[in-house]
Amino acid sequence: MQEYKPFKEGKVREVYDNGDSLIIVATDRISAFDHILRNEITKKGAILTQMSKFWFDFTKDIVPNHMLSVDVNDMPEFFRNERFDGNSMMCKKLEMLPIECIVRGYITGSGWASYQENGTVCGIKLPEGLVESDKLPEPIYTPSTKAEIGLHDENISFEQSVEVLEKIYPGKGADYAAQIRDNTIALYKKCAEYALSKGIIIADTKFEFGLDENGNVVLGDEMLTPDSSRFWPLEGYEAGKSQPSFDKQFVRDWLKANPDNELLLPEEVVIKTVDKYKEAFELLTGTKFES
């Protein structure tokens, strides 16, 4: 049996080369504030993979995506075991664009802090009088650069995203930048409307895109998971305060409240985080998470 080693390890993912495809494995690691924590969140990788699959299927009419299969029987023998079953996705190879495509439908987090300071979010002027967690009149696109592990992503304007892409793809930067912006907004609008019907507000999220062998823009990475998004319960939503969430915010809040944490979470925080991820999965997909 051929052995495989990841050629790329991100904060929470491992990527294996499978010839004409990639196998992306979502681990149970969790990161916050650009650091990898010492705990693992049981079954987190499987929940994220199955949730991405759901959204990729749901949005393939808007933009093609990189997913080929989540069935380990379609993968080499090395992956056909408990370690990889459920948390692995075989994907098309893409040349990833170096832009994180962030879309915000509600004002919260760093966006809220910036708005309080100067009435803008990532340089975009917003109406006066907004309160924390308010729904924005229209979703806003706030791209950022992709940072290496240990470094912070940097917010950039749309115009700067054009410049970044133009340097790599002369004559095509403006077109690619517009395509990923327009796809980001379209994906968010469709999915946010659907999620609302299931009792979940998608406050914000991020997408990543790449180019296939023909230079077409394709959606890659993960999609609308609790790792890449802020999910709030619709029940009890009230603008003017921070909201409870189904995502990593629970972990972030604990780390902020315990600055001497040494990146180690107490067991009850781990259990609550798993429960939140599962609840979000089951509400959104309408299926029970089978661990």
Question: Which positions does each model-derived feature cover?
Answer:
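Hydrophobic/aromatic-rich, well-ordered segments within soluble, folded domains that form packed cores
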Residues: 14-18, 200-203, 207
